[in-house]
C-alpha cells in the first residue's frame, strides 16, 4: 500500500472502532476551503473532531506526535467552519480526539489507541 492507501485504510478502521465504542459518525473526510478533518462524530451531546494517524513503524515517533501545534490549529479552524455552517443552533460541547492505528508490514492491525480530548 502507498501512503494514501495506508491513510484511507486507517480511517476506515477508525470509523469501525469509533462506532463499536458508541460514537455516531456524522461525516468522514470533511473538506472545505480551509482544509480537511478525517472524521466528525458525536458522542452523547459532544461533537468530536477526530484526526486519524496510521503508522507501520515507530521510526518517526508515535502517530499522535505528528499532530503538532500547527496541525492542531489547522484542525481547529476547519472545525470552526464546520460548526458555523453545518450545525443547527443547538448547544453542543466540542472535543478533539486522535486515533492512532498501528499496523505491521503485512497490513495487520497490531493496536488501535483512542486519545480523547487530545488537544
From Swiss-Prot:
Recorded hits in InterPro entries, A to Z, give: Restrct_endonuc-II-like, tRNA_endonuc-like_dom_sf, UPF0102_YraN-like
Protein name listed in UniProt: UPF0102 protein Athe_0977
Looking up Pfam families in the UniProt record yields: UPF0102
Signal peptide residue numbers: none
- Give the source's domain of life in one word: Bacteria
Q: Which GO terms describe its molecular function?
A: nucleic acid binding
Q: Where in this chain does the entry annotate a coiled-coil region?
A: none
**What's this protein's family per the entry?**
Belongs to the UPF0102 family.
NCBIfam families with a match to the protein in the record = PRK12497.1-3, PRK12497.3-3, YraN family protein
Source species, please? Caldicellulosiruptor bescii (strain ATCC BAA-1888 / DSM 6725 / KCTC 15123 / Z-1320) (Anaerocellum thermophilum)
Amino acid at each position: 500500500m502507498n501512503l494514501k492507501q495506508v491513510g484511507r485504510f486507517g480511517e476506515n478502521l477508525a470509523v469501525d472502532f469509533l462506532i463499536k465504542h458508541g460514537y455516531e459518525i456524522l461525516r468522514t473526510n470533511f473538506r472545505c476551503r480551509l482544509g480537511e478533518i478525517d472524521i466528525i462524530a458525536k458522542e452523547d451531546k459532544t461533537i468530536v473532531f477526530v484526526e486519524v494517524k496510521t503508522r507501520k513503524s515507530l521510526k518517526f515517533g508515535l502517530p499522535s506526535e505528528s499532530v503538532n501545534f500547527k496541525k492542531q490549529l489547522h484542525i481547529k479552524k476547519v472545525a470552526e467552519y464546520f460548526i458555523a455552517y453545518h450545525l443547527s443552533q443547538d448547544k453542543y460541547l466540542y472535543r478533539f480526539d486522535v486515533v492512532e492505528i498501528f499496523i505491521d508490514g503485512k497490513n495487520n492491525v497490531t493496536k488501535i489507541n483512542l486519545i480523547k480530548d487530545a488537544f
